[in-house]
Amino acid sequence: MAVSASPLGLEYVITAAKQRTGLSDFGDDSFRAPLKILLEALVEQADLNEAGTQGQSARIIEILCQRLLVQNFFNKYPEILTEEILNPVVIVGLPRTGTTMLHRALGSDQRFYTSRWFETRFPSPPTDWDFTGEDPRLSVAKAEIRGMLDANPDLAAMHPFDAEAAD
């Protein structure tokens, strides 16, 4: 199977993301070569069944959609790139070592701003949102978490999922 003709082909996923968002500016194209390598590896080495192929394709298309939305946001609000973040605190650690709890503890202090799960999962607000009312990303994130936990209730024991909490 030719990579370009499959759901894991570079042009397939890029075209799908453009069609889904109605956007076409990905910004810097440096992501394309590594993405092509990933897609080729998924086709040639991952031994995916049809569900796995469709799942990986959907995941990559969603990531590309987020890239398009973020670039669109930068294009609409270029002043974002001039914002200065003074004294950032970055939390890095291995899984299951308490990094989420540390993030949430620091986030409870008003001197810090922490990105919430839904903001991390969907970094750019929708292009048509006027910044009044509830952020539309929140309901999508809550539904996604609900779906993950419904599909695998054991996830709740591994990670404290909360769309509105720091993560």
Regions found by a protein language model. Give the residues of each.
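Glycine-rich phosphate-binding P-loop
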Residues: 90-110
